[in-house]
């Protein structure tokens, strides 16, 4: 909040009971990430309605998008990632991700150049290297080291889909 104040930006901090809810709902061995994300999104939707916001901008960058693609592919059996623009299921909210085409390393360099702090994740699970997202993040780092540009290639693939070459019959064109 200090950075926002110093720059004259409005900042709203909302304290929630998400941690308590998660402790009551999840088993000890459960990964909290998807439930936490849904609960936080619910808070954002509610706040957007309260202040009359027409869009909710999230800070997901290209690495987040690619990691989500691989997590869904490997562990959920879905071919989906994070769109740059998403309308909520009820049509009342529009989520935008203006940094979705920016790699994490580029976002960090820009923030540093602008004198903006890099705020680390405050989630206790975030540093757990055994979590699937952390493992996928390491996999991508290794791939990028061995094959520079592979992350950009994966990001490009998300904009260049050939539905007829996938197994989903809903994407097949009838002759």
Model-based region annotation:
Residues 36-47, 85-90, 140-158:
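Short, basic, helix/turn surface patches
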Residues 116-175:
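The feature marks non-catalytic terminal segments
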Residues 1-71, 75, 105-113:
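ATP-dependent adenylation/nucleotidyltransferase module used to activate substrates
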